[in-house]
Amino acid sequence: MRHRSGLRKLNRTSSHRQAMFRNMANSLLRHEVIKTTLPKAKELRRVVEPLITLGKKPSLSNRRLAFNRMRDREMVVKLFDVLGPRFAERNGGYLRILKFGFRDGDNAPLALIELLDRPDEGEEGANVSEAAAA
């Protein structure tokens, strides 16, 4: 039976996959928008959304859980001090995934993954749409 086997392996070992998603999660929380392939973006959503939910409840145990998953003190501080209050009224759905064309070398589908409710979202959204049109 194929029940509960929904994890994408992405042609990597489990340790490589874990390290890759840890790095991608840190990059997404640092820059609030990143460009990657579509399957990686969809799988990254499963990693980052629970982290933001942890950030909404600032307790010592939640900070330790977040640090255990991210391994970056600076991003844990941002998660609990900036992103947690920003998404306090939102019940899930903290990310947006936009298809972004295809990569030149191997024609892999690309995607932009970004946090919602960014302070400069209006300006960045215009730049992203111009880049997508080009």
UniProtKB/Swiss-Prot annotation:
Q: Which GO terms describe its molecular function?
A: structural constituent of ribosome
Q: What's a single GO BP term from this record?
A: translation
A Gene Ontology cellular component where this protein is annotated is: cytosolic large ribosomal subunit
InterPro entries attached to this UniProt entry: Ribosomal_bL17, Ribosomal_bL17_CS, Ribosomal_bL17_sf
Keyword list (alphabetical) reads: Ribonucleoprotein, Ribosomal protein
User: Record's superkingdom?
Assistant: Bacteria
For this protein, the record's NCBIfam families field holds:
L17 (TIGR00059)
Q: Mind telling me which PANTHER family this protein's record contains?
A: LARGE RIBOSOMAL SUBUNIT PROTEIN BL17M, RIBOSOMAL PROTEIN L17
Q: Which HAMAP family match?
A: Ribosomal_bL17
Family, per entry: Belongs to the bacterial ribosomal protein bL17 family.
Protein's name according to its UniProt entry: Large ribosomal subunit protein bL17
